[in-house]
Amino acid sequence: IIARAVAANVGAVITAGVTVEDSRKAIEAARAHERVFAGVGVHPTDLAGPLTDGDTADLDQLAGVPEVVVMSEIGIDHQDRSPDRQWQNQAFQAQTEIARKHGLPLVFHIREQGDDYDAHSARDAALSLLREASAGDLGGTAHYFQGRWKHASQFLDLGFHISFAKTLLRIPDLEETARKTPADRILLETDAYPQPFKKNRDKWTEPRDIPGVAAKLAAVRGVGIDEIRRLTTENALSMLGSKATVVRALVEPDRIE
């Protein structure tokens, strides 16, 4: 995966944790590969109950590791079979506090029931929690964004970035959001989670797919792809804040995921 990313001119990859144990594996991957950096966190759909004191202590310890550059992946998920919403709110709050302690930007997941682009319960819950924690000053991004412009603008108003993935290639409603998002707030990603539902392993989403998203974004915004490469690299480094130092030393100006 890393070799294919390098061949596609992706300069660096952030691999996210979705459980405490998975976060440890993300750190191991970052230590093993110089182009890989880690995020730590518990994903809302991986909750089996409220975060325990042990969970938060473990995440606190992991968040202080030098290879960790973001609190990820945390969030709110309101699908029918998602875990209890109170558990999710508690986990989101606890992980935001850990992020603040360690100066980590937030990479957060928001998913509505039935992937309804006009639904808003998950978004409203996330916005409320972010405002309550004054989390905008931490920086971060609404990751794998799939909402309408009116929804994106609410996260932008708090100071967050908007991250576009391969869904931009297949969801026309996202194009308005991609056009209107300020140039200094756009990020690119692939959200390369395991995809066993795809029978052909070669079709799994990977960091190597970033150039395709960049090309689509360039077409939607009416600019050249070199401009998209430049601004999204600058934006990623800006989003990382103080954690950008270790990435900046590696990444060339036109390459980053």
Question: What is each stretch, according to the model?
Answer:
Residues I1-E257:
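Mid-domain alpha/beta scaffold segments of enzyme catalytic cores
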